[in-house]
């Protein structure tokens, strides 16, 4: 009987050890080795600390007392004031996403190509994105492109292949006039 109870207790102890999940407790953590954690240097705390008195700032003067503002050049006229103002920021500037002819050729697009088709073929992210067709690459098949802009070389290459070009703004303008 006693032997059985001892076996049961041993089995129960094993089960209990299995159930124990987290072994990292504050009682069994080992301290980190010396030098593994760099301590912050405390300055200005007396001569025994090696960084007392002037606290690593040298002796007296402007830089020992405080910092100087960004762009300060010691009283000399700073560069942002020496250089003249130039140009202006356009109020209604439009950013065009560049699409090269090689991108159209690589995606295998043919026939009528507009923003919706470009989004489906993952050349553009959104239909509302303004995009300009540029002439890098060659086009072999005739394509009819509706875009927000064309470079001169792209126009020539598309028309040489037997295709046509139209500006999206002109089409939208014509559509709005027909509604009136």
From Swiss-Prot:
Organism: Leptospira borgpetersenii serovar Hardjo-bovis (strain JB197)
A GO molecular-function descriptor: structural constituent of ribosome
Biological process according to GO: translation
Protein's name according to its UniProt entry: Large ribosomal subunit protein uL15
Keyword Ribonucleoprotein among record annotations: yes
Gene responsible for this protein: rplO
Residues in coiled coil: none
Keyword Membrane annotated: no
Family that this chain belongs to: Belongs to the universal ribosomal protein uL15 family.
InterPro entries (UniProt xref): Ribosomal_uL15, Ribosomal_uL15/eL18, Ribosomal_uL15/eL18_sf, Ribosomal_uL15_bac-type, Ribosomal_uL15_CS
Purpose: Binds to the 23S rRNA.
GO CC terms in record: cytosolic large ribosomal subunit
Assembly mode: Part of the 50S ribosomal subunit.
PROSITE patterns per record: RIBOSOMAL_L15
Disordered, as annotated region: 1-62
Pfam families, sorted: Ribosomal_L27A
Keywords: Ribonucleoprotein, Ribosomal protein, RNA-binding, rRNA-binding
Basic residues bias locations: 35-44
């Amino acid at each position: 009987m006693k032997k059985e109870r001892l076996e049961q207790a041993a089995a129960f102890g094993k089960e209990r050890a299995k159930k124990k999940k987290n072994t990292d407790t504050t009682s069994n953590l080992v301290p980190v080795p010396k030098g593994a954690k760099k301590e912050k240097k405390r300055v200005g705390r007396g001569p025994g600390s090696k960084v007392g008195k002037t606290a690593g700032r040298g002796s007296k003067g402007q830089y020992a007392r405080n910092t100087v503002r960004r762009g300060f050049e010691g009283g000399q006229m700073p560069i942002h004031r020496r250089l003249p103002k130039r140009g202006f920021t356009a109020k209604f500037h439009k950013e065009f996403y560049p699409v090269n002819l090689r991108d159209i050729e690589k995606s295998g697009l043919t026939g009528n190509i507009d923003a919706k088709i470009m989004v489906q073929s993952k050349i553009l992210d959104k239909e509302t994105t303004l995009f300009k067709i540029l002439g890098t690459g060659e086009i072999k098949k005739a394509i009819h492109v509706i875009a927000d802009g064309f470079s001169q070389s792209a126009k020539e290459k598309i028309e040489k292949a037997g295709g046509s070009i139209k500006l999206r703004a002109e089409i939208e303008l014509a559509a709005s006039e027909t509604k009136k």
